[in-house]
Amino acid sequence: MSSLIQMVPLRATLILSILCLFVSTSLAKVGNVTAQTRAAQITRKGDKILTEVDTPVEMRDLIQTLKGRTDIKFVDDTKVSVTEYSKLIIDEFVYNPEKKTGKLSLKAALGTIRYSSGKIARNSGQNVKIKSPTASVSVRGTDFTMNVQEDGASSFILLPSVDDSGKSYVGSIDVSTLGGKV
């Protein structure tokens, strides 16, 4: 009887450990690669991973393209295209699907990045930041393209968005630099 009593806590500990491992693994993924042309890679915790369609994307990933292009869809439906010779870091991604709110922070280190707002920007726009070496962009539910040169100089182009019903609209972005805010 005493050996049975000792086994119950051991089994419970084992089951909880397996559940914790499953939860931590499922929480790590913030999106997927949805389209890929030529080679691109993700650097994750020092490991280099060649990307392909359905490669999971996680917080702290560095996405780097050479002659390739990678499209990413986050779990809140945010879409990001990383074009040729570009580098993008996923700094932070937190999303509550029930409330459709969260926080997104990206760093564009080099090249051209196209951003299309998902649910976080539509419902918690103040919590979406995209940084370059020389500027920071706050997103208010829209699409834009940014280009970062090797010297860090950055340019931004605001684009019209199309909602789920096909209606076109233009959101807004706030660009901040050391010289001020636009």
Locate the predicted segments by residue.
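Bacterial N-terminal signal peptides that target proteins for export
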Residues: 2-14
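Serine/proline-rich low-complexity intrinsically disordered segments, especially terminal tails, linkers
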Residues: 4-5, 19, 26-28
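Bacterial N-terminal signal peptides
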Residues: 13-22
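Flexible, surface-exposed loop/linker segments and immediately adjacent secondary-structure boundaries
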Residues: 27-180
